[in-house]
Amino acid sequence: MSFTRRKFVLGMGTVIFFTGSASSLLANTRQEKEVRYAMIHDESRCNGCNICARACRKTNHVPAQGSRLSIAHIPVTDNDNETQYHFFRQSCQHCEDAPCIDVCPTGASWRDEQGIVRVEKSQCIGCSYCIGACPYQVRYLNPVTKVADKCDFCAESRLAKGFPPICVSACPEHALIFGREDSPEIQAWLQQNKYYQYQLPGAGKPHLYRRFGQHLIKKENV
């Protein structure tokens, strides 16, 4: 895969933009001989409404004190009339070599055969080691069940029933695409679009792909 090593800093992370053919990605995926799921967030389509996050909260019974998913509104430029925002999805990246898995003392944090990083609730002892180890800070301790929770692509609530993650179905702007990483839809999108991946130190390769986009929002008169 060809890529432009143009980087910018979002917090303490590194962003690398990729362009061109995704054929090498497809080849690597086939060599693994595993079904790997991936998600695409098209920031050029996202309007920052957070309908996806609200749908996630309802479907997965996320308490008010926790969050599996949110869309951060990052101001880029600002003037008297309008602000330019970058709408950035904050959720588990299902990264390879995930530090949350490495630190879990009971094996409750694990990766399934589809590449989804999950939490086995019956094995979680609520020690919060995984929460502290996650560089993206996208895990939380459920105050009711006392177990760690995070985005798992709706593995039990939706995928097991043959439905895509609720955030994908709920998005009014069709800014989210989900499927097998080697599927024609995902591969075609990666071939046809310039995208990036956001990776923090200490974490492996993410399985969340992003198309960069910014939006000018006019300020209302007060």
From Swiss-Prot:
GO terms for molecular function: 4 iron, 4 sulfur cluster binding; metal ion binding. Residues 37-67, 83-114, 115-144 form the 4Fe-4S ferredoxin-type domain. [4Fe-4S] cluster 3 binds at C92, C95, C100, C134. Exported by the Tat system. The position of the signal peptide cleavage has not been experimentally proven. Can also be exported by the Sec system. Keywords: 4Fe-4S, Iron, Iron-sulfur, Metal-binding, Repeat, Signal. InterPro entries: 4Fe4S_Fe-S-bd (IPR017896), 4Fe4S_Fe_S_CS (IPR017900), ET_IronSulfur_Cluster-Binding (IPR050954). Gene3D superfamilies: 3.30.70.20. [4Fe-4S] cluster 2 binds at C56, C151, C154, C167. It comes from Escherichia coli (strain K12). Induction: Up-regulated by the oxygen-responsive transcription factor FNR under anaerobic conditions. Repressed in the presence of nitrate or nitrite via the two-component systems NarXL and NarPQ, respectively. The gene is ydhX. It holds the Pfam family Fer4_11. This is Uncharacterized ferredoxin-like protein YdhX. [4Fe-4S] cluster 4 binds at C104, C124, C127, C130. [4Fe-4S] cluster 1 binds at C46, C49, C52, C171.
